[in-house]
């Protein structure tokens, strides 16, 4: 018995010292007792915070202007009352919403010394962002299918892409996003957090939160990987197959005007898909030992994509340009 006591004390003391040194004022390893997290943000010199704040402010202003403007144009112009613009309006709403989940808090943290976020706030941020980013992936797949029907079966377009089907596709996208978000959020916050409260990111994301856990992450990562495959593979397959048929059909069109019209809408959609999926793949394939690269990728799909989407669709789409001009003329902005 005497020989076993030192071994017991040697086991207990490092754990206690680790709790004190890494957890600070939290003083517990139980996630249910945790009251907040600290968003570490970017590892830059303090004097660069003002520059980052101005950059985030500019991007967020562009997101608000572009996406609110796009939704307003689509709702006010009868010529844009088509399935494609119904999907585009929902895409603008999603971009506006999920950027608003992240950016305001990130901008506040550039100025505030208190960079904490409440436990409930962190849960809400992860849940909403996961819901909306997955919904956007399914919505982009629905938009690819819409382009496939419009180009490959134009005579049946109004019949096949009915209002009911469009509503079902959008509702299904939100439903899939909600189910995925519930699973991801519940898995993340049932972990035991026994490391620092500091989340090495500018918002609450699942991977940085996993780094704070002392639980066995094998099963968690396997479920996350399976969930990602279930989400990403079907959407990518729908997009790729749709565009294979689209390209095959467009190549059979002999008129130059037909080529331009087909590629103008398709190239806009492909640009949005490329930016979003490219950033997502880059972020999740980046090893954990390079957290700064992961943050850069997160910036692409959380800030850059919502800013670029309205620009991509407006610059490459004559219908949107004409609707915007008509809207501005009504408001007497253009003399």
Curated annotation (Swiss-Prot):
It comes from the Eukaryota. It is found in: Cell membrane. CDD domains: 7tmA_OR9K2-like. Residues 1-50, 101-124, 186-222, 284-296 are extracellular. Residues 72-79, 146-164, 243-262, 316-335 are cytoplasmic. Gene3D superfamilies: Rhodopsin 7-helix transmembrane proteins. Disulfide bonds join 122-214. InterPro entries: GPCR_Rhodpsn (IPR000276), GPCR_Rhodpsn_7TM (IPR017452), Olfact_rcpt (IPR000725). GO terms for molecular function: G protein-coupled receptor activity; odorant binding; olfactory receptor activity. Belongs to the G-protein coupled receptor 1 family. This is Olfactory receptor 9K2.
């Amino acid at each position: 018995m005497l020989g076993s006591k030192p071994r017991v004390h040697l086991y207990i003391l490092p754990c206690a010292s680790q709790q004190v040194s890494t957890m600070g004022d939290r003083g517990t390893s139980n996630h249910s007792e945790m009251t907040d997290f600290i968003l570490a943000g970017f590892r830059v010199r303090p004097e660069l915070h003002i520059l980052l704040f101005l950059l985030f402010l500019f991007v967020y202003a562009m997101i608000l202007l572009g996406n609110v403007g796009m939704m307003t144009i689509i709702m006010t112009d009868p010529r844009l009352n088509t399935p494609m613009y119904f999907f585009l309006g929902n895409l603008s709403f999603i971009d506006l919403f999920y950027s608003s989940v992240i950016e305001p808090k990130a901008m506040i943290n550039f100025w505030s010394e208190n960079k904490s976020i409440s436990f409930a706030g962190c849960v809400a941020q992860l849940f909403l962002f996961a819901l909306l980013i997955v919904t956007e992936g399914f919505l982009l797949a629905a938009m690819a299918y819409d382009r496939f029907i419009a180009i490959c079966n134009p005579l049946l377009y109004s019949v096949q892409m009915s209002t009911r089907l469009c509503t079902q596709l959008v509702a299904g996208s939100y439903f899939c996003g909600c189910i995925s978000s519930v699973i991801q959020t519940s898995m993340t916050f049932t972990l035991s957090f026994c490391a620092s409260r500091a989340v090495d990111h500018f918002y609450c994301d699942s991977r940085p939160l996993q780094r704070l856990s002392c639980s066995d992450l094998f099963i968690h990562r396997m479920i996350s990987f399976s969930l990602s495959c279930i989400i990403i593979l079907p959407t990518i397959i729908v997009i790729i197959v749709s565009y294979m048929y689209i390209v095959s059909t467009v190549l059979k069109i002999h008129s130059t005007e037909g080529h331009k019209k087909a590629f103008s809408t398709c190239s806009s959609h492909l640009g949005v898909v490329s930016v979003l999926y490219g950033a997502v793949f880059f972020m999740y394939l980046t090893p954990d030992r390079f957290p700064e690269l992961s943050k850069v990728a997160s910036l692409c799909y959380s800030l850059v994509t919502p800013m670029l989407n309205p620009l991509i669709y407006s610059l490459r789409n004559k219908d949107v340009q004409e609707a915007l001009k008509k809207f501005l003329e009504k408001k007497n902005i253009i003399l």
